[in-house]
Amino acid sequence: MARPARLPAQSHPADRPRPGEPWTDDPYAHALRTGRGPLFMRRLRPPVDRDDAGGEGELLPLDVERWCAAPDAADTGVLQRCAGPVLDVGCGPGRLVAALTAEGVPALGVDVSPAAVARTRQRGGAAVRRSVFDRLPGEGRWGTILLMDGNLGIGGDPLVLLARLRTVVPPGGRLLVEAAPHDVDERLTVRVEDAHGRHGRPFPWARLGATALLHTAEAVGWILTGRWADEGRSFVELHRPRSRQHDERASAGGRTEQP
């Protein structure tokens, strides 16, 4: 994600509509329908004590226009590493699913946002509305999982997310992940917000740079097979090992956390 930004002066709280569900009934859905921002993820400050409700913190811009455009050069480098069938977790408006489908690579997008699923289908891709922590189509048979555009933060606990994704690919399957461009390792509470201060409800999120990502991935049994940067973005390629013994050790190590 880009550097923190500042919003214009906000309207009075009494003038704002009631916050909707994250990603489904908030400014994100409107931005996907129009293909335009500005849109932000606002970091919420934790409460100082039990009587403090916390407050508003820095803004992290969300690159809606890029998500709604055709794949760029950095995206294309990722797509060239895909072995079908491909599952795009948090597919957003579906640029990657649509591009793979156009090349004849079987691909499916998964997203909790109805607007994201609808836009993916409009672009000619297949998508289902579902959480990654729910039962997914074709579990254990996907050749590649994509986790792009900051979606490593889904659920707020990357250890749990990466452990879950190991169950979605077979031994030898791969995971292509976009890490934060900076060396960060944080768990936070955020909300999606537009330039007018309209926002959805808070939800847990996480941000990991490549170093923290690799430590977390190793802890749940993924093996590093590639790492690169392109157009200011950072990417990692991981594989689920083919060794059954390695899988058993990883399962034992990640058994304490549940989504």
Indicate where each model-derived feature is located.
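Conserved class I S-adenosyl-L-methionine
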Residues: 83-92
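Conserved SAM/SAH-binding beta-strand->alpha-helix loop
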Residues: 113
